Amino acid sequence: MSPWKKSVLTAFIPQAIKAIVKDEIKDAKLSSLFADHSLMHPKDKKIVLFSVPGAFTPTCSAKHLPGFLTYASAFKEKKVDEIVCLSVNDPFVMKAWCDANKAGNDILFLADGNASLSKAMGLTFDGSMYSLGVRSQRFAMILTGLKVEKLFIEKPGVFDVSSAQKVLGHLS
């Protein structure tokens, strides 16, 4: 048995992820520690994915993640099958961030360690001047299967349109 708790799934996002092309994520192959997870079979699943520049960073830890934790049950009421948090960190950092925030089964934490998915979507920025390297921009998206229904991209240094409350307001 893996030392990872089943409630805390971390995953690698391999180089096989190509891009969002015509509003659909193509070849989104996730290798995870738990093969039975819904993201392994996303067809017909409603997924809310939000991306943060980094685990344990100020805005991500104080505002972005807590909003999705607070409204997790409201997302489930809106028939969202999975809430996913993506960050350019390694899976061990993502697990520690999940544990530190007592996220349990509410949010799936995915590590985009080499920024493969973020780069493929064209949603990265260079944080080298802050000793962060390449990071994902702050954004959120609503997906049905792998089709992107809505995409909310933040301007640099801003936290607004990708908040849990704003995303929740776009779900019918």
Q: Where would I find each of the regions flagged by the language model?
A:
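Chalcogenol-based redox active-site neighborhoods
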Residues: M1-S172
